[in-house]
Amino acid sequence: MMSTAAATTTHTIEARISLEDETRCQQILALWMAALNRYDATAMDALMRFPHVRLSAGKVTVYDTPGNNPMDLFDRLRQQDGWHHSAWNETKLVQSSPTKAHYAVRYTRYREDGSIIGIYDSLYVFSALDGDWRIQCRSSFGP
């Protein structure tokens, strides 16, 4: 129940991500998808902030350091579903401050013949330290 007292906020509408930083986050999302499709864990690590949190399939996984991103997920996807690549359908900034940004994203997983395996929604949380934006957390409805 909301009290009648004025609610306090952590930031104001004016205190949002700059256009330059928003562009950088969009670039990171493009680089992320390209690295994922190349099956390049090192490139993915370079775009992540550690510790990095992933919420998916009812589990919370914390990657404390680079080099711990298990690529076996993609091996399983290839074996189970014939996964070949993924693509963003939508990447939308939904909340931000000068040092944090929440992106609602939707992506599609495809087989080599172009048929669709599934379409999934996720939330990607970016954080900036000294102007260096990286993906800090991912919460996905996909496997």
What is each PLM-predicted segment?
Residues R54-L55, Y103, I135-C137:
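Short hydrophobic/aromatic-rich beta-strand segments that constitute the beta-sheet cores
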Residues Q95-G131:
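Exposed beta-sheet edge and beta->alpha loop/turn motif
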Residues S3-A7, I117-P143:
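Short beta-strand edge/turn micro-motifs at domain boundaries
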Residues I28, A87-W88, Y120:
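Residues that act as N-cap/strand-start positions at coil-to-secondary-structure junctions
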